Amino acid sequence: MKRTFQPSVLKRKRTHGFRARMATANGRKVLSRRRAKGRARLSA
């Protein structure tokens, strides 16, 4: 059976990266929530 997680750095960055988050209003909300929580890493 094929596993669900097939790692790809490019796909990871494009979907969950900082610039992807900044591109949308909701993505910016995600970043602000993570800043408020005090996360060391904001995005992938």
Curated annotation (Swiss-Prot):
One of its GO terms (biological process) is translation. The keyword Aminoacyl-tRNA synthetase does not apply. Residues 1-44 are annotated as: Disordered. PROSITE patterns: RIBOSOMAL_L34. One of its GO terms (cellular component) is ribosome. It holds the Pfam family Ribosomal_L34. Transmembrane segments: none annotated. One of its GO terms (molecular function) is structural constituent of ribosome. Keywords: Ribonucleoprotein, Ribosomal protein. Signal peptide: none annotated. InterPro entries: Ribosomal_bL34, Ribosomal_bL34_CS. Residues 10-19, 30-44 have a biased composition (Basic residues). The keyword Ribonucleoprotein applies. Belongs to the bacterial ribosomal protein bL34 family. This is Large ribosomal subunit protein bL34. It comes from Saccharophagus degradans (strain 2-40 / ATCC 43961 / DSM 17024). The gene is rpmH.
